[in-house]
Regions:
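N-terminal secretory signal peptides that target proteins for export/translocation
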Residues: 1-2
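Sec-dependent N-terminal signal peptides
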Residues: 5-14
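Subset of outer-membrane beta-barrel
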Residues: 21-424
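Sec/Tat signal peptide C-region and signal peptidase I cleavage site
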Residues: 16-20
Length: 424
């Protein structure tokens, strides 16, 4: 048993870089800590992103750690997923397309005792990936010039969680995740003079290295009904985070000729320490389930992005509090029927008011999702497929509308590890 757990932990350590691949590419990742990776895993995402009141014994619902108590006392659960994001960016004057993808999550869970369960894994938190340019016509002082803004990086997390379901009140479950956040944030501003060979171009670069611990608390209450149905109420709370950063600042001049840059002089170079302040967030949810037949759920979430600060600076004119609304359902026609009847059919919708307000315009987001849980021979093991179409932003006020189509695939396996064999 323990050899298997050690193997999983070693496997996770080798795939950290792969798990941290960019999964979103959006011009709005310029703000805050980047474009928030809003999915949880393939199963949650296919049901509109609901998670607060979702309890299952065959996948890891890491957004609410209280859900880990649903894991069987003799089972080890492993879940790995990959997804691709296809985007179309539209402004009033141009259209561009892109595609990115990567490992969306690697998660596992197992029992410590009948009332105590543990989970862990690695997954991305946010992605920074933007490039923008602003050109100015020739004038009598400095001639034509161009500003270029670039950024890349993101934050990932390795988490370890524990959940407790007291035997004297087994309707209630409480959980806690300890999350190690790490990553890099690079951004630069470049000034060039395309029509003047005598003018020196200049660039300012910022590189932040991030490393910190954060905590996520969860609670779930399950009321079983006389007919075997169940109602679950769930909630979670993520503490505000102080992320210490190691900062590198560099300002230098260069010449640009035939696509080749030649550095001329370093104006300033320094290493400093700073911080990023991440806001608190909380969510509540409600679900109703008829075992082995259907489930419906609703979620509401709030994140206080108005309290975000980068190197001690807040951005109240740009960042605002974000409210999320999620609804989803799952239907299984007949778990004892033919193969098509055993498939879990999932669908959902999600809406965010958005954390950004640019030119007095809120950058909201709306998405609809569809998914399938394809059982394989081993009980509790599935291949899950997830599709989502959505849009973010608008073309009004010279902004950008982003249409996205996401496809996700995950493999969730439940294996019996924790039992004694009567015969060897």
């Amino acid at each position: 048993m323990y050899k298997k757990i050690v193997f999983i932990l070693l496997f996770l350590s080798f795939v950290i870089d792969a798990g941290a691949q960019n999964t979103v590419s959006s011009p709005y990742s310029k703000y805050g800590i980047g474009d928030n990776v809003g999915f949880t895993n393939t199963i949650n995402a296919s049901m509109g992103g609901i998670y607060n009141a979702l309890r299952r014994n065959n996948f890891v619902n890491h957004r609410n750690p209280a859900s880990y108590t649903a894991i069987d006392t003799q089972s080890f659960v492993f879940d790995i997923g990959y997804y691709s994001n296809n985007i179309i960016l539209q402004s009033n004057s141009a259209v561009s397309k892109g595609n990115t993808g990567g490992i969306s999550h690697i998660l596992f869970a197992f029992p410590l005792s009948k009332t105590l369960k543990m989970a862990g894994g690695i997954l991305p938190v946010s992605v920074i990936d933007f490039s923008a340019a602003e050109s100015f016509p020739k004038d009598s002082i400095i001639g034509s010039h161009k500003f270029i803004y670039d950024g890349e990086g993101g934050i990932n997390k390795v988490m370890l969680g524990i959940a407790y379901q007291p035997s004297f009140f087994d309707k209630l479950s409480v959980g806690l995740n300890a999350e190690y956040l790490f990553g890099n944030y690079y951004r630069s501003s470049t000034l060039t003079f395309p029509d003047s060979a005598n003018m020196l171009s200049s660039r300012v670069e910022y590189n932040y290295s991030i490393s910190a611990i954060n905590f996520n608390f969860g609670l779930q209450y399950q009321q079983n009904l006389n007919n075997g149905d169940a109602i679950v109420i769930g909630a979670n709370y993520v503490l505000p985070s102080h992320l210490p950063t190691q900062n590198q600042y560099r300002h230098y001049t260069f010449t640009y000729n035939a696509a080749v840059e030649t550095v001329k002089d370093s104006v300033k170079y320094e290493n400093t320490e700073g911080s990023i302040e991440l806001p608190q967030s909380f969510g509540v949810g409600l679900s109703y389930e008829r075992k082995n037949k259907f489930l419906i759920g609703l979620d509401f979430g709030y994140t206080q992005w108005s309290e975000f600060a980068l190197q001690g600076i807040r951005y109240p004119e740009i960042l605002k509090d974000n409210y999320t609304f999620n609804a989803g359902a799952e239907y299984k026609p007949d778990i004892y029927g033919n193969y098509l009847e055993k498939i879990a059919y999932r669908f959902g919708v999600n809406y965010q008011t958005g954390m950004l307000s640019l030119y007095n315009t809120d950058i909201s987001q709306l998405g609809v999702s569809l998914g399938f849980g394809l059982p394989i021979k081993k009980q509790g093991t599935q291949v899950n497929i997830y599709l989502e179409y959505g849009k973010q932003g608008t073309k009004e006020n010279n902004l950008i509308r982003e249409d996205y189509f996401r496809v996700g695939v995950s493999f969730s396996a439940k294996d019996r590890w924790f039992f004694k064999r009567k015969y060897q």
